[in-house]
């Protein structure tokens, strides 16, 4: 939406644009492919659209976690590096929250929890006290090898200058170093220089 907003301003179609986006992974529905015309006699299947529509590589027909494993193989990224980066991200977020870095940009949302109304104003995904050593104990989330339901693919692209690692072909993506499943929303006002001056 930010790109489209900027294009609108550059093209002269608008002077001020409110750009926004939402993510509601927890409410992603299950799809029943046979539901429209009937399953007839026998069992049917429910498909998790969070995975099939949001986390699925439509070109290669496998989970995006497998894509991450493939990229790690190609670029020689180790499990240790992935865990260190993930822990660093969590630590920076924790420090920013404690320092109130983004409080002025956060709009609290009232949420009904049972009979009470709770003001939701702190991102619930970050975890305090995360260390690379701690998350290194987690098992990989995506099986590898010929028995894997998400087999790795053979790449014709091999970047030069990348060092082979002992982790190649091993499980590296875990619940701790992968993207989280969460909800959120953000909005931003873009304006031309003339509009700002007005």
Residue ranges of each PLM-predicted region?
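Catalytic-loop motifs flanking and including active-site residues across diverse enzymes
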Residues: 1, 60-64, 180-186
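Flexible glycine-/small-residue-enriched beta->alpha junction loops
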Residues: 6, 16-71
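A short, structure-level motif marking secondary-structure boundaries and short turns
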Residues: 52-54, 78, 177
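Flexible glycine/proline-enriched surface loops and loop-helix/loop-strand junctions
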Residues: 53, 69, 73, 169-175
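N-terminal extracellular/periplasmic Venus flytrap/periplasmic-binding protein-like
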Residues: 81-197
């Amino acid at each position: 939406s930010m790109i489209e907003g900027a294009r609108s301003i550059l093209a002269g179609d608008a002077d001020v644009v409110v750009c926004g986006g939402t993510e509601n992974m927890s409410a992603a529905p299950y799809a029943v492919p046979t539901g429209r015309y009937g399953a007839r006699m026998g069992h049917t299947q429910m498909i998790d659209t969070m995975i099939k529509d949001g986390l699925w590589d439509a070109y290669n027909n496998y989970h995006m976690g497998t894509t991450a494993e493939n990229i790690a193989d190609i670029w020689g990224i180790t499990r240790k590096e992935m865990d260190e980066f993930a822990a660093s991200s969590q630590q920076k977020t924790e420090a920013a929250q404690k320092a109130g870095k983004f409080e002025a940009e956060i709009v609290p949302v009232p949420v009904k929890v049972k009979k009470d109304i709770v003001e939701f104003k702190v991102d619930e995904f970050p975890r305090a006290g995360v260390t690379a050593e701690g998350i290194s104990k987690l098992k990989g989330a995506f099986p590898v090898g010929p028995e894997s339901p998400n087999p790795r693919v053979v790449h014709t692209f091999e970047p030069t200058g990348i060092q082979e690692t002992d982790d190649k072909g091993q499980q590296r993506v875990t619940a701790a170093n992968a993207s989280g499943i969460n909800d959120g929303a953000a909005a931003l006002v873009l304006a031309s220089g003339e509009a700002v001056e007005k």
